[in-house]
């Protein structure tokens, strides 16, 4: 008789976990633990152990769901509420490291009742392994809560997602009904929750604390493995611009559209001395940016120009970088951005797009696909955008102008974002 699925899963979980455990032992790395001094992340390298790690996570998730059964896992639970309370009331920083505190004392410091403090913390303990209760009535740290207590960036990340995104999710379907799913960034669940007609980035200009928290969260997310600018700097054949330059000079010009403070442009200029970079962004974004670039020789080949990417492009160039530009915009607005480039495009000019290329379901590991689907719903909730698949990207460029030709589209090994090379054939 063939083994049942749950026994098969348990066996495969054991096999993959053994590979991860052997790697940790061989490299004298700490074993995962919920304890206060447990490691906060996996520092694993190598394709085999990474694959085993992802497999163990996916198989464990499936086994957990099978053992629960659909009648249980379909029940809605207030899964984010306890973390939202922990974030809003900064509970983690009020629990002593390598110590404990009574619920009564903790409640007093947090400005909550003892009953609510106890219920939020105990939910977080059993559902998220955030905090522990070493003896009845007393709270101490777990690895996760200690991370929150000691790392202000992680507190920013939790606060952004739980205090800004989480309550907006409940308003998203209402926004779709109310605004007829029109794709505008100021007609979202986020807008209904915050009671504003401003898009998030406009709202942040008058809410500096939220703006700082958002910037901190985005910096954290961007620098995660596979999302840093290294993917673009190292993953694109920049030297090919020399062979196909449309410029009248010997140094190809690359315009970084929406290039923020010039970090990515400087990295490209440093890695490729043959290129000249021009960073374009809104005046408030680029003000003083060049003076803040590191004093290295490549800095002389990075210039800045105030420009709104919805306005007609004024600078003819060999290539235009659009890194994380389309990610925040619906198709109708992404088409506007592309059409604004057309006035300055010369035959053979390239668009180098660095953004998500969502694969079809089942290609990614379960953990990575879950993260992708999370981001897709977050983009809907915050700005009416979405994560585009290959066919979506091709359709977008065709809708903007049939003279755009998608020459290549790929995701570099180890990256979570892809690179599209689009040629202007006008």
Swiss-Prot record:
Enzyme Commission (EC) number: 2.1.1.-
Active-site residues, record numbering mapped to chain: 327 (proton acceptor)
Binding site for S-adenosyl-L-methionine: 258-259, 281, 308-309, 323
Domain of life: Eukaryota
One GO biological process term: methylation
Keywords, ordered alphabetically: Methyltransferase, S-adenosyl-L-methionine, Transferase
InterPro entries: COMT-like, O_MeTrfase_dom, SAM-dependent_MTases_sf, WH-like_DNA-bd_sf, WH_DNA-bd_sf
Pathway info: Secondary metabolite biosynthesis
Molecular function via GO: O-methyltransferase activity
Family per similarity comment: Belongs to the class I-like SAM-binding methyltransferase superfamily. Cation-independent O-methyltransferase family.
Role: The subsequent chain release by Dieckmann condensation (DKC) could be catalyzed by the TE domain present at the C-terminus of pyvA and/or the alpha/beta hydrolase pyvD, installing the tetramic acid moiety.
Record-given protein name: O-methyltransferase pyvH
Name of the gene encoding the protein in the UniProt record: pyvH
């Amino acid at each position: 008789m063939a083994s049942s699925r749950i026994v098969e899963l348990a066996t495969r979980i054991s096999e993959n976990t053994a590979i991860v455990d052997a790697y940790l032992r061989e490299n004298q790395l700490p074993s995962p633990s919920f304890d206060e001094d447990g490691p906060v992340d996996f520092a694993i390298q190598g394709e085999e152990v990474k694959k085993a790690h992802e497999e163990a996570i996916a198989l464990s998730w499936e086994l957990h769901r099978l053992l629960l059964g659909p009648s249980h896992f379909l029940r809605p639970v207030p899964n984010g509420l306890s973390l939202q309370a922990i974030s809003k009331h900064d509970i983690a920083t009020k629990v002593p490291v390598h110590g404990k505190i009574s619920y009564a004392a903790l409640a007093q410091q947090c400005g909550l009742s003892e009953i609510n403090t106890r219920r939020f913390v105990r939910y977080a303990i059993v559902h998220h392994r955030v905090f522990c209760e070493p003896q009845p009535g007393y709270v101490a740290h777990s690895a996760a809560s200690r991370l929150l207590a000691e790392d202000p960036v992680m507190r920013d990340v939790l606060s952004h997602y739980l205090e800004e995104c989480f309550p907006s999710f409940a308003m998203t379907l209402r926004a779709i009904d109310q605004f007829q799913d029109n794709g505008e960034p100021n007609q979202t669940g986020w807008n209904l929750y915050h009671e504003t007609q401003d898009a998030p980035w406009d709202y942040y200009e008058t809410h500096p604390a939220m703006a700082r928290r958002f910037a901190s969260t985005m910096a954290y997310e961007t620098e995660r493995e596979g999302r840093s600018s290294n993917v673009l700097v190292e993953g694109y054949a920049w030297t090919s611009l020399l062979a196909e330059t449309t410029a009248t000079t010997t140094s190809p010009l690359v315009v970084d559209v929406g290039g923020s403070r010039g970090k990515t442009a400087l990295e490209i200029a440093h890695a490729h001395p043959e290129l000249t970079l021009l960073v374009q962004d809104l005046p408030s974004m680029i003000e003083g940016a060049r003076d803040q670039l590191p004093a290295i020789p490549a800095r002389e080949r990075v210039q800045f120009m105030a420009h709104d990417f919805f306005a007609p492009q004024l600078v003819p160039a060999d290539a235009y970088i659009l890194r994380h530009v389309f990610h925040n915009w619906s198709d109708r607005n992404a088409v506007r951005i592309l059409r604004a480039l057309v006035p300055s495009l010369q035959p053979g000019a390239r668009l180098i797009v660095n953004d998500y290329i969502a694969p079809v379901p089942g290609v990614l590991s379960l953990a990575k696909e879950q993260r992708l689907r999370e981001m897709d719903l977050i983009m809907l909730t915050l700005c009416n955008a979405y994560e585009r698949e290959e066919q979506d990207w091709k359709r977008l460029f065709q809708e903007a102008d049939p003279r755009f030709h998608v020459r290549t589209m790929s995701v570099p090994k180890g990256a979570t974002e892809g690179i599209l090379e689009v040629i202007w054939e006008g």
